[in-house]
Amino acid sequence: MIKIKLYEHDVHRNECTFRPYVWAQNVLKDVGIELTDGDSYDYAWIAQASIINKKVSLGESVANGLEFLQNISGDYMILDGQDSTSLIGTYEVFKESNALLLLKNSLLKDRSLYKQGLQLGRYYWGEGDYKLEDFDQYSDRIVLSGTNWLATHWAGIKVQWFDYSRPKEYDVSAMFQYPSLTPSYEHGLIQSDYYDKFRKPSIDILNKMKYNIAKLDQGKRVSSEEYYKRLISSKIIFAPFGYGEMAPRDLEAAMFGSILIKPDMSYIDTSPNPFIDGETYIA
């Protein structure tokens, strides 16, 4: 039996990263893998919340992450379970550490793009182009984790399939936050302006259509019960990107027998990957 220690698995963002594996631990045991929090193990897994801090400078975050890893004995791997293809913060720690692998939920299918300068949805450490010019030196040890944000959301939840033949009141569901009622900040940076800017064109297009559209009234939230009532009653579920490319709505559309429309996912490399344009969603 191979034992894998989950370091600081109760820390919020670490818990999200480890959650799919914890829920599958009985299956993992069947193939000879045991998860543990004890001191006897073959490999240690270190998730991103233990080695990055978005509230300080990138340099300070990397230094703190490397200091944390100095206390790890034996072989270890780094897991970056964030819902973005960006490697900023974890990559810098990984390449200066003794980690065997960097496991990532999703990566750019064209790995050469990491060397060209992209922000990839993360600007906690500045808004300039983020280039990994030495990426090729480490790319063979940067691999997919076998999980992604869909697995995190649905870990331990039994999928319920609804009656597809039931009448649907709405043509399109646009039940996403817009506009923001109050400014939203994360790590001292405003997020709501970013969201509103790219969601406004979507709402503008929908408002011009002569269809019955389920949406929020001036961004005012509704109860969970009302939210799912409208979602289930929609023929089409429109799902713009959020912090990353995947969201619970992606699977809920299939559960509710609705057509999923979202931005193109063909540039994403992830596993499992249910996104097949023209079959499981429409780009």
Question: Where do the protein language model's features map onto the residues?
Answer:
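Nucleotide-sugar donor-binding catalytic core of glycosyltransferases
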Residues: 2-34, 39-248, 255, 259-277
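Conserved acidic donor-binding segment of nucleotide-sugar-dependent glycosyltransferases
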Residues: 281-283
